[in-house]
A protein has these predicted regions:
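Phosphate/nucleotide-binding beta-alpha loop and adjacent structural elements of enzyme active sites
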Residues: 1-316
Length: 316
């Protein structure tokens, strides 16, 4: 059934589907003509990326500049990218005017928000469309642990939050958070620290600074980050809602006392393993919360976003 859907999608976007299907037999390039009249020399993976973006591509201009280099533009945006990222940029351009300031740095703007950041930030914005951060934050204080480049804080602000309290340990990310808070006049406290079981510092190893940088990252490079104990962060925040996306550091919430967890009424927590998921669910249920929603991450079976709401009048 899946194969039939792939064949059908291929036939509906290309004028020479037999040639397209022949690409699956090897790593060759062929000239593929799309239904909108545009022709590109593509491998099968390249065709698949363009095929999956075709509804948008049929309304914009896509020019092939090299073997795997494309210029994507419409009336308000202009981007040079590889085929693999065409679906991402196509989706982002539906919602924002996008200007590419360098190979991996972008300026986004629509009638509600303005942001600057990396390709990884665009991926995070795309993921927000799944509804993973959906909540009633109108007039509320939101604690944002794992602020990355400020895109999640901007999301909550756009949804009506009155203040953001942001924790992010990576200096490069903190700089972008500050820029994005200023661009949008967001009322925010920004803390250049991560969270853990106790105050201190920790060495993080990595190869690339990206959203996946965390306590269990591996690589040849290293940075030292500041850690603040999670109990103090929760207790001092005065927040109504807390969002955690901190690459396995969310596990420290298991060791926070129930009465401290209850100081915040709603939690959105991205978990990064089946083991952490189980421990977090057990902890929050025992602390007087109900699991209100869970969104699974596509292609990452052990990753999901859990939303917990405090049960009124519950006593631990």
């Amino acid at each position: 059934m899946v194969k039939l859907r792939i064949i059908w999608r291929t036939m509906t976007v290309s004028q020479n589907p037999i040639v397209v299907l022949s690409l699956k037999r090897g790593n060759t390039k062929r000239s593929i003509k799309f239904r909108n009249g545009c022709t590109y020399r593509l491998t099968w993976p390249q065709f698949r990326s363009l095929r999956d973006s075709y509804p948008f591509l049929s309304r914009c201009f896509l020019t092939q500049l090299g073997d795997d280099l494309f210029r994507l533009e419409d009336g308000r945006s202009r981007i040079v990218c590889i085929s693999k990222t065409v679906p991402l940029f196509s989706e982002i351009m539906e919602d924002f005017a996008v200007q590419q300031e360098s190979e991996n740095f972008f300026h986004l703007e629509n009638e509600k928000i303005e942001l600057v950041g990396s390709t990884d930030m665009l991926v995070c914005i795309q993921e927000q469309k799944s509804g993973e951060y959906e909540c009633d934050c109108q007039g509320k204080v939101v604690l944002d642990v794992g602020g990355f480049e400020g895109e999640s804080a901007a999301y909550f602000w756009m949804k009506g939050a009155k203040k953001l309290i942001i924790y992010e340990p990576v200096a490069e990310h903190v700089e972008l958070i500050m820029r994005n808070m200023t661009l949008n006049h967001i009322k925010a406290e920004v803390h250049a620290t991560g969270i853990g079981d106790k105050d201190g510092t920790q060495i993080i190893y990595y190869d690339k600074i990206d959203p996946g940088l965390g306590l269990h990252s591996k690589g040849k490079k290293s940075i030292e980050i500041k850690i603040t104990n999670a109990s103090e962060v929760l207790e001092q925040s005065g927040a109504d809602i807390a969002k955690f996306d901190c690459e396995s550091a969310e596990e420290c919430l298991v060791h926070v006392q129930a009465q401290i967890l209850q100081k915040i009424g709603y939690y959105i927590i991205e978990v990064h393993s089946a083991q952490i998921r189980k421990a977090i669910i057990e902890k929050f249920r025992s602390a007087g919360f109900v699991l209100e929603n869970e969104i699974r991450k596509p292609n990452m079976p052990d990753f999901s976003v859990l939303s917990f709401r405090k049960i009124p009048l519950f006593r631990s």
